[in-house]
């Protein structure tokens, strides 16, 4: 497999999160159209970096309705979201593995048993025994570093 390649790095205020999420949503949809496969977006950053907040913005940019709450699945490990229509129509999984035991097997989560997902958004992927098992076709990593009222977003892409 190829190493991750830096696509871009931006530091923005929290008010610009929608713009960042929109740009990444466009990239994910272009990938899905080109490959007919799901994407897997890894979110990395410390506690409070804004991973779940970003996930909500990304799902909204993909077309999730404002009335549907996007919450952290810290205790349930996975939340599912359905976008009923549009270019991004389909099911999406948001995983938060922070409380998982180190070395968790992806099969234990039942991610691939639940339904065919158009995309997977994964917080704390390093908790998996085989992190690559959640990325059969594509990985996007975003490293977010807290910096007061702004965040630094570094997008890395791996295509294989």
Predicted segments with their positions:
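Charged, amphipathic alpha-helical linker segments immediately N-terminal to NTP-binding catalytic cores
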Residues: 1-19
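Short phosphate-coordinating micro-motif centered on Lys-Gly-acidic
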Residues: 1-3, 102-160
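Phosphate-binding P-loop
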Residues: 27-38
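Short hydrophobic/aromatic beta-strand immediately N-terminal to the Walker A/P-loop
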Residues: 40-42
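P-loop (Walker A) phosphate-binding loop of NTP-binding proteins
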Residues: 44-46
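Conserved lysine of the Walker
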Residues: 51
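Short beta-strand-centered segment that lines the nucleotide-binding/catalytic pocket of NTP-utilizing
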Residues: 64-81
């Amino acid at each position: 497999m190829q190493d991750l390649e830096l696509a871009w790095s931006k530091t923005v205020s929290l008010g610009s999160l929608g713009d960042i999420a929109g740009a990444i949503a466009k990239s994910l949809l272009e990938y899905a159209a080109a490959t007919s496969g799901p994407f897997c977006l890894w979110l990395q950053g410390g506690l409070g970096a804004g991973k779940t907040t970003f996930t909500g913005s990304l799902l909204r940019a993909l077309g999730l309705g404002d009335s549907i709450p996007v919450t952290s699945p810290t205790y349930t490990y996975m939340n599912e979201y359905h976008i009923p229509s549009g270019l991004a129509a389909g099911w999406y999984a948001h995983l938060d593995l922070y409380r998982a035991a180190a070395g968790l097997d992806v099969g234990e989560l039942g991610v691939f048993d639940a339904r065919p997902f158009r995309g997977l958004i994964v917080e704390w992927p390093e908790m998996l025994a085989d992190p690559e098992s959640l990325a059969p076709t594509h990985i996007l990593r975003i490293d977010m570093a807290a910096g007061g009222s702004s965040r630094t977003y570094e997008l890395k892409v791996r295509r294989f």
